[in-house]
Amino acid sequence: QYDFSFFEYWASDYAGHKQDMPWAIKQLEVFDGVLKGLLTNWNMENDLVLLTSDHGNMEDLGTRKHTAAHVPLLLFGAKTNRDAFTDVSDLTGVTPAMSSLLGL
């Protein structure tokens, strides 16, 4: 039993920098399968899955650089856990909200 687990899917980041749309789409399809498996087996009544990114770049394959695109903050799980992120408006708010949720 763990209180916190972190997973980074670097392949989508690499796909954006590679500027290869068919390969980028394949990476998103692979991640969709991983996420589906996770959410299908997740305890939604007690736990939380947080999905976000630190930058965009796959939406604009005309550049290899990070873009300023707004990225989503998706939360799956118990409403009481999701409520800890109500005031999060950008990436800098994720760590304080997570720390509060974990009682740190």
Each PLM stretch: what is its role?
Residues 1-104:
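Feature captures the catalytic ectodomains and active-site-proximal regions of enzymes
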